[in-house]
Design a protein with these regions (language model features):
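Ligand-binding clefts of soluble mixed alpha/beta catalytic domains
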Residues: 1-547
């Protein structure tokens, strides 16, 4: 390995160390004292509950851990959006799990909490996975009620989804382990089965204080909406237990008795490890995002090897449209179609030198055709993003780059097979769209620590914004010195760089998680396993395409 490989490896490992540090910080929720208070009430933390619930010999993939990262700081922050969530196995069955974190503002819902819960319900609906709610929440965070309560994608959408999932036959189980108040009280009741822990679990539309204020009635928490009340008087809950462990054990039993569903039938054979060492991924990705590299080196370390020891990647139109690599492969045994941005400089058969990471007419045309082929064959698609955008200039415009780009976007948008997106490096502008960014409904979307997501590259954006700002100042008659201009540029670049980081994207749930590159195989395999649980694949139609 050369010096540059070692440098890249050092930078990536440093990034991963920082990632683990941040994840540990998030795992503390509302802090040590809040956790101790939870334990004093014989209550587990959300991560302890999930650990107790899930099969220990199978992976639990946490999603949305960075939701709310560096947001709501005026309110003390909202680690993980006040909700711990992900996909795990319960009694051998893959499930979506959502657990309120009572240590974070009593489990109150911030705007990002609603967005995260809706994302988890979306995953359950798209993949027909059972969903388990571990409820312990004080309801809407009142200081921000205007941003969480009334709109289409706000708090009320949760209960609409409860009803829709029930109609779709998706199992929903709610274990009420703490408070469940106001509008949130509808969630367990709209689930298939509701379990409560005596002494801690409570469900009511209005708590004792509000009841006193509204109608003058004095009543305690347990009598108003405790486990005994709802299992013996109202009939709202189905089971009551003395401890959380007993309650969660019953959840396991319920899930264990579910009928095994039909699947989509995506092809899978015995898995073989990659043909090249997967940990070498750390040294392949340049520490400088503008530098070229060969995307095949990434793919060969993610996909399975064949029996002959070589990579299972079979390139489609290998010598045409070289700035996008398309091909069929096996990944943990699954048959997949891969669409990946080639980052090295290539030469077309017409003699044109093409920049890596840029989508040209021929590569857009090739990718569109390949995506259509995968839909025809019902093969899941994996997008590996490191894209700076579409080629610009008169040569591309006259050749119809907009037409070819639109054809690729059309194919991605109308694709009916599951799409899984991994943001490896750059993800800029329309390139993000064409390579199945968040707006194009990937079943799952993950980012490496090296990812950058923005409308354009940092230097380009900063210089453009600087020109606008300086022009505005000059229009007002203000003279701008070179030193002032440089200070403005540095400030703009700093702000823009923060907004392009994977942490910013994960905080806003533009990606489901930031992952270690070595985990890429596992998360893609688990994503396809989840997608395979939905047997329904719609008919593939593209509508009007300009050719």
């Amino acid at each position: 390995m050369n010096v540059e490989f070692n440098r890249n490896e050092d930078v990536m490992k440093l990034s991963l160390k920082q990632l683990q540090k941040h994840l540990h910080q998030i795992s503390q929720g509302g802090g040590k004292k809040a956790i101790e208070k939870q334990h004093e009430k014989n209550k587990m933390t959300p991560r302890e509950r999930i650990s107790y619930l899930c099969d220990q010999d199978k992976p639990f993939i946490e999603l949305g851990a960075f939701a709310g990262w560096e947001m709501y700081e005026e309110y003390g922050g909202c680690p993980a959006g006040g909700t711990v969530a992900g996909i795990g196995y319960v009694s051998g069955r893959q499930c979506v799990i959502v657990a309120n974190d009572q240590t974070v503002k009593a489990g109150a819902w911030f705007p990002i909490t609603g967005k995260k819960n809706l994302r988890m319900q979306e995953i359950a609906m798209e993949n027909r996975l059972p969903i388990i709610y571990l409820v312990d929440s004080a309801g809407v965070f009142l200081p921000m009620q205007d941003q969480i309560f009334p709109d289409k994608e706000h708090f009320g959408r949760i209960f609409r989804n409860n009803a829709r999932m029930s109609a779709m036959g998706i199992t929903q189980i709610a274990a009420v382990l703490g408070a469940c108040v106001a509008g949130g009280a509808y969630l367990p009741i709209m689930s298939d089965e509701t379990l409560m822990v005596e002494g801690n679990g409570s469900i009511y539309l209005a708590g004792p204080y509000l009841v006193k204020a509204a109608i003058g009635e004095d009543i305690d928490n347990e009598t108003l909406g405790g486990a005994v009340t709802h299992t013996e008087i109202s009939g709202i809950a189905d089971y009551k237990f003395n401890t959380e462990q007993e309650c969660i054990n019953q959840v396991k039993k319920i899930i264990g008795k579910l009928t095994h569903p039909l699947t989509a039938g995506f092809d899978r054979i015995a898995s073989l490890t990659p043909s090249k060492e997967i940990t070498e991924l750390y040294g392949i990705i340049p520490s400088d995002s503008t530098k070229p590299y060969d995307m095949i080196d990434i793919i060969d370390r993610i996909v399975d090897r064949n029996d002959d020891g070589k990579s299972s990647l079979e390139q489609f139109k290998e010598d045409y449209g070289k700035t996008i690599v398309c091909g069929y492969a096996r990944l943990d045994g699954w048959a997949v179609g891969i669409v990946a941005n080639q980052r090295k400089i290539v030469k077309s058969k017409k003699g044109e030198m093409q920049m890596g990471g840029v989508i040209y007419n021929d590569s857009a045309d090739k990718a569109a055709r390949f995506i259509m082929n995968c839909n025809q064959k019902k093969i899941p698609l994996v997008f590996l993003q490191d894209v700076t955008g579409f080629m610009v200039g008169s040569r591309s415009e006259h050749a119809g780059i907009i037409k070819d780009g639109a054809k690729m976007v059309n194919a991605v948008a109308n694709s009916v097979v599951p799409k899984i997106t991994i943001v490896i490096g750059n993800s800029y502008g329309a390139g993000n769209y064409a390579m199945c960014g968040k707006a194009y409904d990937p079943r799952f979307i993950y980012a490496w620590p090296s990812a950058k997501i923005a409308v354009m590259g940092g230097d380009q954006a900063a210089k453009t914004l600087l020109q606008i700002q300086v022009s505005g100042m000059k229009a007002k008659g203000k003279r701008v010195t070179p030193e002032e201009e440089q200070t403005l540029l540095d400030n703009i670049k700093g702000r823009y760089e923060k907004q392009t980081s994977p942490y910013y994207a994960a905080a806003h749930l533009w990606v489901d998680a930031i992952i270690d590159p070595v985990s890429t195989r596992q998360v893609i395999s688990e994503a396809i396993y989840a997608a395979n649980q939905n047997p329904k694949i719609e008919e593939f139609k593209t509508g009007v395409i300009q050719v």
